[in-house]
C-alpha cells in the first residue's frame, strides 16, 4: 500500500517583488513561493535523504504547478574522484561516495515540452522550462523559512557590454561538405544510429582563479561544478550523449598550466598538460578547464574542432562568466560541441524559435537546444571519424537503487528501457519486461534497420573523395566494415595531388577551408619564410622548439595562402599561430613537388615512401 506523505504544509503566497539581489544577479519582477514537497513511499519505508523521485507543488504566476523530479543517476561515474593540492603542493585525491547526491532532472506536469535541472541540496535551485519560457528558482536566505524566489530568465538584469563570443573563428559556411549536409533533415536512419547513447567521461579542472573566486572554499567550487554538469548532462540528452563526471580537479595551490588572457595560448597549454599529466593518472574522454580569468576581447570559451578522444586536443576552456549556472553550462556545451565536430551555426541553421547552442555569440536569450545543422554535423563526425572513446559506458553509481522498468533509465538487469508500454517508441524493446524482443538481431549501427541487419550490399559509407572506397553492409553485422581507401600515393584531382589515407589533400582546399573563397595557394616565394625557424615560418616542432625547413622542404611547413577576397590584399597570408597550431601547417600527404608529398615536415618521394 502506498501512502502519500505530505512533508511540509503548503504555504504559497502570491507575493510579487519588483527588484531583488539574488545569487543569479539583480532581478526585476520576481515571485516568492513556498514549494510543498509530496513524496510517495511504501508504508513503513525509511525515507532516504535524497529520494530517487520527488514532486513539488507550487504556484507560478498565480497558477498551480507540479514539478516532477528524478535523480540524475548519470551525473557521476562509480570511479569518480576529486583532486586538490595542499599548500606545499602535494596532490590529494579522494573518491567520495556520490550515490546519494541531490541533483535532479525533471518536468512540469501537463506540459509535454517542459524540462528542469534542479539542485535540491539546500532548497530548490536551478531552472525549469514552463510553457516555452525559462524560469529560475533559488531559495531566499531567510532564517527558518522555506521561501524561494521564482523569476523569468529575461528578468535578470543583463550587463551592458559587448556580446560574449566563442574564440573559435571558423564559421559553418566555410565547410562545404557540412554546409551541404545541413540542408538535409535528420533521417530515420540517422536517428537509428544516434539512438544508442554515446558516453563522454568528463574531467573538469577548476583553475586557481576559481578557487580564489569562491572564497578558497573547496565545497563552494564543487557545488558550482555539480550544478553546471547537471545541466550539461540535460542539454546533451538531445544529441543522445550522456555526460558523466569522472573527475574534478581544483588547482588550489596554483595553476598547473599557463592560464593567460590569450584563450589560444591557454587552450594549447591546458591540452599539453592534459596529455602529459592528467591522462596518465585519470582515465577520461574529455577535459574542460573552468577558469575565472577574463580572456582578451569578448571571448568566453575555446576548443578544438572534431578532436574528441585526442590526447591533447579533446579539451576546451570555459570562462566562469555568469552567476547563472545555466549560462556557464551552455558555454561548456558549446565548447564540447566543437570537440564533437560541431561548427558555429550559419543563417540557415535552426532549432525552432530558440537561439541554438552552437551560435557563435552567447545571446541574452536562453539557449538549450542544438540546431538541425548540429545534428547533421554530429552524425557526419560519428560516421566519419568513429571516435571510439565515447562508445564505452561509464561505471554506474546507482548500484544501490533497484532497477525500475519503465523509467527510461537503463539499469542493472535490463536490456532496454523505453518507458511505459503506452509511451514506448522503441520497437526493439518489450516495454513490459525491459528485454529485447526475441526476433531482434541488432539495436543500433549503420547496418541495422528496424532491429534487423540490413541487406548485404547496402551502401553504408559513401566514398568521400576519389581516393576513398565506398563500403557496404555484409548482412551479418550491424556495423559498417572498416573504412578502406585506395593506395596512398595514387595521383588524384588531375595530378594536383596524391591520395593520402582516403583523401586528396591540396593546398588550395586547405586555404579555402581556413579563409573562404577567393583564397588560393600562395606563390613559392612566400614559403621561403619557412627557413627562418620562427613563429612565421618553420617545418616542425621538437621539444617545443620550431625547426626551420631545409630549402627542399619549405612547402611542408607553415601554410601560406594568397587572399584576394574583397577588401583584402594579402599575398602571403598565414593562419594565426595562437589559434590552432595543427591547422597552420601544410597537411600531411599534400603534394609539395612533382612525385613528392609532405610527411613530418619533409618533402619525400612518393615512389620510395609507399
From Swiss-Prot:
Q: Which family does it belong to?
A: Belongs to the venom metalloproteinase (M12B) family. P-III subfamily.
Motif location (D/ECD-tripeptide)?
466-468
Example GO CC term: the record gives: plasma membrane
Establish whether keyword tRNA-binding is in the entry.
Answer: no
Cross-referenced InterPro entries, in alphabetical order?
ADAM_Cys-rich, Disintegrin_CS, Disintegrin_dom, Disintegrin_dom_sf, MetalloPept_cat_dom_sf, Peptidase_M12B, Peptidase_M12B_N, Reprolysin_adamalysin
Binding locations of Ca(2+) 2: 404, 407, 411, 414, 417
Q: What residues are glycosylation sites in this protein?
A: 217
List where in the cell it is found. Secreted
Q: Which residues form the propeptide?
A: 20-188
Put simply, this protein is called: Zinc metalloproteinase-disintegrin-like 3a
Q: Which cofactor does it need?
A: Zn(2+)
Superkingdom of source: Eukaryota
Amino acid at each position: 500500500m502506498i501512502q502519500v506523505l505530505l512533508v511540509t504544509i503548503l504555504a504559497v503566497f502570491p507575493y510579487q517583488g519588483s527588484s531583488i539581489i539574488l545569487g543569479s544577479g539583480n532581478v526585476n519582477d520576481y515571485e516568492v513561493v513556498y514549494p510543498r514537497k509530496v513524496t510517495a513511499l511504501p508504508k513503513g519505508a525509511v525515507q532516504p535523504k535524497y529520494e530517487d523521485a520527488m514532486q513539488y507543488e507550487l504556484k507560478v504566476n498565480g497558477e498551480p504547478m507540479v514539478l516532477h523530479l528524478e535523480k540524475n543517476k548519470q551525473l557521476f561515474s562509480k570511479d569518480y574522484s576529486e583532486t586538490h593540492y595542499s599548500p606545499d603542493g602535494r596532490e590529494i585525491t579522494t573518491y567520495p561516495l556520490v550515490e546519494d547526491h541531490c541533483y535532479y532532472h525533471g518536468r512540469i506536469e501537463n506540459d509535454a515540452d517542459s524540462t528542469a535541472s534542479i539542485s535540491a541540496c539546500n532548497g530548490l535551485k536551478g531552472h525549469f522550462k514552463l510553457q516555452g519560457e525559462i524560469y529560475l528558482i533559488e531559495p531566499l536566505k531567510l532564517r527558518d523559512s522555506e521561501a524561494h524566489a521564482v523569476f523569468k530568465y529575461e528578468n535578470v538584469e543583463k550587463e551592458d557590454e559587448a556580446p560574449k563570443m566563442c574564440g573559435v573563428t571558423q564559421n559553418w559556411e566555410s565547410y562545404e561538405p557540412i554546409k551541404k549536409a545541413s540542408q538535409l533533415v535528420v533521417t530515420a536512419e540517422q536517428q537509428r544510429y544516434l539512438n544508442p547513447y554515446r558516453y563522454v567521461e568528463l574531467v573538469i579542472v577548476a583553475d586557481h582563479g576559481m578557487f580564489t573566486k569562491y572564497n578558497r572554499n573547496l565545497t563552494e567550487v564543487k557545488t558550482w561544478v555539480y550544478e553546471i554538469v547537471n545541466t550539461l548532462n540535460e542539454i546533451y540528452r538531445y544529441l543522445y550523449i550522456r555526460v558523466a563526471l569522472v573527475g574534478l580537479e581544483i588547482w588550489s595551490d596554483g595553476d598547473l598550466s599557463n592560464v593567460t588572457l590569450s584563450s589560444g595560448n591557454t587552450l594549447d597549454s591546458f591540452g599539453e598538460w592534459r596529455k602529459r599529466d592528467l591522462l596518465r593518472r585519470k582515465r577520461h574522454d574529455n577535459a574542460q578547464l573552468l577558469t575565472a580569468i577574463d580572456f582578451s576581447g569578448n571571448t568566453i570559451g575555446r576548443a578544438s574542432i572534431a578532436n574528441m578522444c585526442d590526447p591533447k586536443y579533446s579539451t576546451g576552456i570555459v570562462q566562469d562568466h555568469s552567476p547563472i549556472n545555466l549560462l556557464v553550462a551552455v558555454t561548456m556545451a558549446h565548447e564540447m560541441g566543437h570537440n564533437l565536430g560541431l561548427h558555429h551555426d550559419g543563417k540557415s541553421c535552426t532549432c525552432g524559435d530558440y537561439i541554438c547552442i552552437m551560435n557563435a555569440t552567447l545571446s541574452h536569450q536562453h539557449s538549450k537546444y542544438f540546431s538541425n545543422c548540429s545534428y547533421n554535423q554530429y552524425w557526419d563526425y560519428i560516421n566519419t571519424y568513429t571516435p571510439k572513446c565515447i562508445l564505452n559506458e561509464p561505471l554506474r553509481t546507482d548500484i544501490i537503487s533497484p532497477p525500475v522498468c519503465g523509467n527510461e533509465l537503463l539499469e542493472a538487469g535490463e536490456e532496454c528501457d523505453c518507458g511505459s508500454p503506452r509511451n514506448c517508441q522503441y520497437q526493439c524493446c518489450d516495454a513490459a519486461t525491459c528485454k529485447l524482443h526475441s526476433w531482434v538481431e541488432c539495436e543500433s549501427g549503420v547496418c541495422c534497420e528496424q532491429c534487423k541487419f540490413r541487406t548485404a550490399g547496402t551502401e553504408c559509407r559513401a566514398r568521400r573523395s576519389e581516393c576513398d572506397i565506398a563500403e557496404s553492409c555484409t548482412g551479418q553485422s550491424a556495423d559498417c566494415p572498416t573504412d578502406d581507401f585506395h593506395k596512398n600515393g595514387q595521383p588524384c584531382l588531375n595530378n594536383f595531388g596524391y591520395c593520402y589515407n582516403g583523401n586528396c589533400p591540396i593546398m588550395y582546399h586547405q586555404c579555402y577551408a581556413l579563409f573562404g573563397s577567393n583564397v588560393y595557394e600562395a606563390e613559392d616565394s612566400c614559403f621561403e619564410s619557412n627557413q627562418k625557424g620562427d613563429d612565421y615560418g618553420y617545418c616542425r616542432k621538437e621539444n617545443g622548439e620550431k625547426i626551420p625547413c631545409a630549402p627542399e622542404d619549405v612547402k611542408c611547413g607553415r601554410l601560406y595562402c594568397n587572399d584576394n577576397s574583397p577588401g583584402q590584399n594579402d599575398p602571403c597570408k598565414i593562419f594565426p599561430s595562437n589559434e590552432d597550431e595543427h591547422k597552420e601547417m601544410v597537411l600531411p600527404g599534400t603534394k609539395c613537388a612533382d612525385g613528392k608529398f609532405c610527411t613530418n615536415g619533409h618533402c619525400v618521394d612518393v615512389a620510395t615512401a609507399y
